Amino acid sequence: MAQTEAMAEIKQQALVDINEAQNEKALQDVKVKYLGKKGSVTGLMKHMKDLPNEEKPAYGQQVNEVRQTIEKEIQARHELLGNEQLEQQLKEEKIDVTLPSRKIAIGAKHPLTRTIEEIEDLFLGLGYEIVDGFEVEQDYYNFEALNLPKSHPARDMQDSFYITDEILMRTHTSPVQARTMEKRNGEGPVKILCPGKVYRRDSDDATHSHQFTQIEGLVVDENIKMSDLKGTLELLAKQLFGEDREIRLRPSYFPFTEPSVEVDVSCFKCKGEGCNVCKHTGWIEILGAGMVHPNVLEMAGFDSNKYTGFAFGMGPDRIAMLKYGIEDIRHFYTNDVRFLSQFKAVEDRGEK
């Protein structure tokens, strides 16, 4: 009887102590006091040896019930203290959602990206397919398939980064055209645009870089004429530099086209009167083009008596420099935020 009363007193006092615990440390102390190895509830079990055998099961069950009650109350108090602590923390860290937020710095498209996408959008609208290719290319596709055999003197026009005797960093995106035509097994039409990085052994200066971007276009079909090329280039010039632009074709030489032309656009700054941009000529050179050489068609498996085509190639770097008044090509590749941030204002105004 005395042990039962002691058990009830321990239980009652434990519940009082649990409710008075104001923090996790105090609650842990209560747990040790009653449920630890030397705790009060643990001590009750030591008296079991003094009881008759028939009373031991009932007594043990009562002690376990007291232990379970205390454990349950400790857990409940633990959760309550945790909620109170969280509530207090939220009050202390309360955020005034009515305060104006900090503006997130927003970037803008790189001027080269803007120029490339503008050109791609135009030709996608004309039904061209955008095709990518290898930057590490075979000598055959970079030169021989484009009417530049190993003995051709025009190879001296392009100093190249060779990796092996037959592998090099491509010097133009024309290999994409050669590979695409080859895959068509002599069946037209072919209508592709090939943007990408190219590499040449140039000394870096304001107008030259060992790595730069290039976009080339190719159309192969029956009855393709020089007038088709001219109309396409006129549309490109107006898209890039304004509706009042005119183009001029000058005879030139490229091994992979015949006839070949250099393409000039009327100066968008002085309207043809002469200025520092056009070097007082009224015209600005923007790209090279021509009719696809019959040898190139034949090497790709096309019948040059049935199919004709035109090709053109331009440097988005140069076009972007002209459009945005940039005097040094190296600005495109140095990642200077001061330079790049200027184009955020251009983008905000919705300008191309």
From Swiss-Prot:
Main location: cytoplasm
Gene that encodes the chain: pheS
Residue intervals passing through the bilayer: none
Record GO terms (molecular function): ATP binding; catalytic activity, acting on a protein; magnesium ion binding; phenylalanine-tRNA ligase activity; transferase activity; tRNA binding
Any one annotated GO CC term: cytoplasm
EC main group: ligase
Recorded family membership: Belongs to the class-II aminoacyl-tRNA synthetase family. Phe-tRNA synthetase alpha subunit type 1 subfamily.
Cofactor(s) needed for function: Mg(2+)
BP-aspect Gene Ontology terms: phenylalanyl-tRNA aminoacylation
Name this polypeptide is given: Phenylalanine--tRNA ligase alpha subunit
Subunit record text: Tetramer of two alpha and two beta subunits.
Binding site for Mg(2+): E258
Catalytic reaction(s) noted: tRNA(Phe) + L-phenylalanine + ATP = L-phenylalanyl-tRNA(Phe) + AMP + diphosphate + H(+)
Cofactor binding mode and count: Binds 2 magnesium ions per tetramer.
Keyword list, A-Z: Aminoacyl-tRNA synthetase, ATP-binding, Cytoplasm, Ligase, Magnesium, Metal-binding, Nucleotide-binding, Protein biosynthesis
Subcellular location(s) of the protein: Cytoplasm
SUPFAM superfamilies cross-referenced by the UniProt entry: Class II aaRS and biotin synthetases, tRNA-binding arm
EC number: 6.1.1.20
InterPro entries: aa-tRNA-synth_II, aa-tRNA-synth_II/BPL/LPL, Phe-tRNA-synth_IIc_asu, Phe-tRNA_ligase_II_N, Phe_tRNA_ligase_alpha1_bac, Phenylalanyl-tRNA_Synthase, tRNA-bd_arm
PROSITE patterns xref list: AA_TRNA_LIGASE_II
